[in-house]
Amino acid sequence: MTSKPNAHVQKNEKKPLLNGIPELKSGWHIDQAILYDDSRLAIIRFGRPSRLTCKLMDDMLKSLQFKLINMAAMYFVDIDKVDDYNDIYDFGDDDDFAIMFFWQNKHIMVDFDTGDNNKLNFVINDKQELIDIVEVVYKSCRRGRVSCRSPH
């Protein structure tokens, strides 16, 4: 399947872009992002964009978007505006952000040695570290695995 950016968005439902990364505005849009691309990861940052740690990770993701474009499509979700997944993924009031990986409609579990393999919810300051994580997740998914261990 050839990937077309935002091809799954209907003409009258354009999403605003935050420096090139689409912001998903509804549970339906999140579902479509997870389902859409069968050859790349869907990396979704669920979070509260007004909080500092979320801003830091958003900046990191924005800076890597084009470097990782062949492996991943990235999306942002404001969990205060779109709360469809807050209970499912256990996002609480004290959560600033959580980055989650999806592959062909499957949630990918990543072991970060934090005890929570569902999501990456700590700040990564090193671009190469995040690139390495995405590469490991992507390669694991291409091999048919739905879980992997972080290289860091």
Model-derived regions, located:
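Short, surface-exposed, polar/charged, turn-prone segments marking secondary-structure boundaries
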Residues: M71-M74, W103-N105, K127-L130, P151-H152
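Low-complexity, flexible helical/coil segments
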Residues: D78-D83, I108-G115, D132-S140
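A short, hydrophobic beta-strand/beta-hairpin element that forms part of a small beta-sheet core
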Residues: L61, M74, D84, D95-F122
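Intrinsically disordered, low-complexity regulatory regions enriched in Ser/Pro/Gly/Thr
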Residues: K14-K15, I34-S39, T53-L56, F66-N70, ...
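N-terminal leader/targeting and pre-domain segments
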Residues: M1-A42, D116-H152
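Amphipathic alpha-helical interaction motifs in eukaryotic regulatory proteins
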Residues: D31-L35, G47, K55-D58, K62-I69, ...
